[in-house]
């Protein structure tokens, strides 16, 4: 039975990760660290312990103090340029907190790190967002977890709480394409709940050492891998 920790639990993918973790018979305890109380905590959950604070400088110490030590640390944490007030602030928040929390998990003795990244992530990208995501990935790989799992979904289909008009339009198109034929959608967009289940399944498999050959240290899942693992 695994004990896990999660940041990003109130986002579109993260909320589904939390739901999947709470329902999974192989997960004994779930600790979330967030700015807002996750929706799943509105009802009593025997497995769930939440830490809620707007002061993100407290998050790493909270993670370090968890008992038992989480076997798996999940991050689907992110923000937007608009919410952060510009890309420079977005970088400080998203890159800074992801790296800080991953380091705290590693130092505490966590074995598996599962990061929800993005398709096109590359430290060499000319696109600032993709470069940021790539830099987070590279720092995660260098931390030396027993297993690092990186998911690179395309467009994420689902309902967000915050307004992102262009993304909403693309999600509408993805939804229509999926109704015509799933293959028209799966190559470039994945449902949030499918991504979440893939993250949970991959994390638990990695904990057991059940990873593809050649991916013993770092396992990267693209769109087709996410679809396959998320529908198991």
Curated annotation (Swiss-Prot):
Transit peptide residue numbers: 1-36
UniProt feature coiled coil, ranges: none
GO BP annotations listed: import into nucleus
Membrane topology: Peripheral membrane protein
Subcellular localization(s) per the UniProt record: Mitochondrion outer membrane
Gene3D superfamilies: NAD(P)-binding Rossmann-like Domain
Keywords noted in UniProt: Membrane, Mitochondrion, Mitochondrion outer membrane, Transit peptide
Domain of life: Eukaryota
The keyword Calcium is annotated on this UniProt entry: no
SS bond list: none
Keyword Ribonucleoprotein: no
GO cellular component: mitochondrial outer membrane
Family in the record: Belongs to the FMP52 family.
Name of the protein this chain belongs to: Protein fmp52-1, mitochondrial
Organism this protein belongs to: Aspergillus terreus (strain NIH 2624 / FGSC A1156)
């Amino acid at each position: 039975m695994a004990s896990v920790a999660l940041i990003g639990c109130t986002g579109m993918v993260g909320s589904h990760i939390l739901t999947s973790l709470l329902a999974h018979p192989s997960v004994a305890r779930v600790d979330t660290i967030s700015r807002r109380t996750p929706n799943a905590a509105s009802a009593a959950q025997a497995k769930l312990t939440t830490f809620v604070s707007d002061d993100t400088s407290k998050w790493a110490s909270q993670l370090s103090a968890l008992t038992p030590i989480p076997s798996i640390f999940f991050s689907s944490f992110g923000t937007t340029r608009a919410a952060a007030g510009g890309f420079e602030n977005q970088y400080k928040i998203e890159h800074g907190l992801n790296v800080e929390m991953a380091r705290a998990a590693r130092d505490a003795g966590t074995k598996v790190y599962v990061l929800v990244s993005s398709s096109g992530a590359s430290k060499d990208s000319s696109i600032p967002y993709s470069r940021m995501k790539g830099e987070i990935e590279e720092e995660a790989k260098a931390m030396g977890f027993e297993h690092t799992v990186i998911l690179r979904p395309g467009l994420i289909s689902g309902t967000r709480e915050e307004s992102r008009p262009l993304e909403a339009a693309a999600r509408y198109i993805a939804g229509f394409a999926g109704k015509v034929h799933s293959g028209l959608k799966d190559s470039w967009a994945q449902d949030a709940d499918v991504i979440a289940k893939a993250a949970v399944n991959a994390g638990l498999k990695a904990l057991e050492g059940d990873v593809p050959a050649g991916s013993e240290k770092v396992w990267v899942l693209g769109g087709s891998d996410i679809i396959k693992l998320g529908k198991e």
